[in-house]
Amino acid sequence: MIFVENKEIVLPGSLLTDNNYKLGRGTYKENGKIYSSITGLVYFESEQIKVIPLKDTYSPNYGDLVIGRVTGSSYSSWSIDINSTYHGFLPTTELYDKNEPNINNIINIKDMLLLRVANVDEINRVKLTLRSRGLGKFNQGTIIKVKQPTIHFLSEENAFLTTMIQEYTYTDVIIGKNGLIWINGLKENIERIIEIIELIEKEEPLKHNLIKHIQSMILNPK
């Protein structure tokens, strides 16, 4: 049995279902029943159930694509701010170019990087990696910070909108799971995308006409 509606707001400990769903983020299983571990919106997706946090806090998971800022360095790693209460670090063993003789020629303090979460340990340290295709340093573009429900709205629930935005504005957009979005293109097109994202931030994502409004903004610019 399912005890909540899709996109219903739930509290920590709320009983979600006793059906055999796969556990997603923000959930846990006890005595054959699935509960919410956080305050957020419930999403039923295929065979999985998850809860997206309402508060603006990012909780890392293995494989997440994130945008981070280099805040410090040591002999063996860099400290990375991933817009979370969790501490991110990038070991030198996780570089995309292990043959570079001077690591400071690769990464510097304040650089913005596109990374993936390689591991989250028992004391909430987040090991990051650049050893996947497409990862690395941002040398241009604009990065903005948004709320977690907005990330879910654009990257999972309505991913087609992000594709549509890129195609019609001739821009590149990368959505980090940690609440940061990178946009690259002409200034006026970047401003259009920011306007669309601000609308999503202000409006209730559950509103039925929001998607149509966004599509209209994309197809019929002022």
UniProtKB/Swiss-Prot annotation:
PROSITE patterns: S1 (PS50126). It is found in: Cytoplasm. GO terms for biological process: CUT catabolic process; exonucleolytic trimming to generate mature 3'-end of 5.8S rRNA from tricistronic rRNA transcript (SSU-rRNA, 5.8S rRNA, LSU-rRNA); poly(A)-dependent snoRNA 3'-end processing; RNA catabolic process; U4 snRNA 3'-end processing. GO terms for cellular component: cytoplasm; exosome (RNase complex); intracellular membrane-bounded organelle. Residues 63-131 form the S1 motif domain. GO terms for molecular function: poly(A) binding. PANTHER family: EXOSOME COMPLEX COMPONENT RRP4, PNAS-3 RELATED. Non-catalytic component of the exosome, which is a complex involved in RNA degradation. Increases the RNA binding and the efficiency of RNA degradation. Confers strong poly(A) specificity to the exosome. Component of the archaeal exosome complex. Forms a trimer of Rrp4 and/or Csl4 subunits. The trimer associates with a hexameric ring-like arrangement composed of 3 Rrp41-Rrp42 heterodimers. This is Exosome complex component Rrp4. It comes from Methanosphaera stadtmanae (strain ATCC 43021 / DSM 3091 / JCM 11832 / MCB-3). The gene is rrp4.
